[in-house]
Amino acid sequence: MPRKGPAPKHAVVVDPVYGSALVTALVNKVLMSGKKSVAERIVYGALEGAKNKTGNDPVVTLKRALDNVKPTLEVRSRRVGGATYQVPVEVRAGRSTTLALRWIVGYSRARREKTMTERLMNELIDASNGLGASVKRREDTHKMAESNKAFAHYRW
């Protein structure tokens, strides 16, 4: 264990176009091999496409999508006397946002549309409407936590 205490949190830079820290976080999740300008082009294109398709503010669409994908419970493995139990625990706010962004980007990469911009746009629109693979992932996570509720007393 480190003796210095927890590492300091970095100040999140707000996005220059939309003025939102969530857009910056999404750009950083899409980022691959240090190509930030490519990631920004993908995210801005997806948000602009979502604005054209839905007619809503793209940041509102992103927030609604994140709210529909954020998990409140997850399972953690806990070893007790030779057996490993899946123990349901509550997810902290920062982790739930990070997981939601990770799932949205991951499942948009797995979609079948031609460009990443289209894939991300459609996944964001689906997630904001309560559809899509990332929302299903959240439901599966909650279902797993619900089915392992009997082991909740092993929480630490």
UniProtKB/Swiss-Prot annotation:
One of its GO terms (biological process) is translation. It holds the Pfam family Ribosomal_S7. One of its GO terms (cellular component) is small ribosomal subunit. CDD domains: uS7_Bacteria. PROSITE patterns: RIBOSOMAL_S7 (PS00052). Keywords: Ribonucleoprotein, Ribosomal protein, RNA-binding, rRNA-binding, tRNA-binding. The keyword Signal does not apply. GO terms for molecular function: rRNA binding; structural constituent of ribosome; tRNA binding. InterPro entries: Ribosomal_uS7 (IPR000235), Ribosomal_uS7_bac/org-type (IPR005717), Ribosomal_uS7_CS (IPR020606), Ribosomal_uS7_dom (IPR023798), Ribosomal_uS7_dom_sf (IPR036823). One of the primary rRNA binding proteins, it binds directly to 16S rRNA where it nucleates assembly of the head domain of the 30S subunit. Is located at the subunit interface close to the decoding center, probably blocks exit of the E-site tRNA. Belongs to the universal ribosomal protein uS7 family. HAMAP family: Ribosomal_uS7_B (MF_00480_B). Part of the 30S ribosomal subunit. Contacts proteins S9 and S11. This is Small ribosomal subunit protein uS7. It comes from Frankia alni (strain DSM 45986 / CECT 9034 / ACN14a).
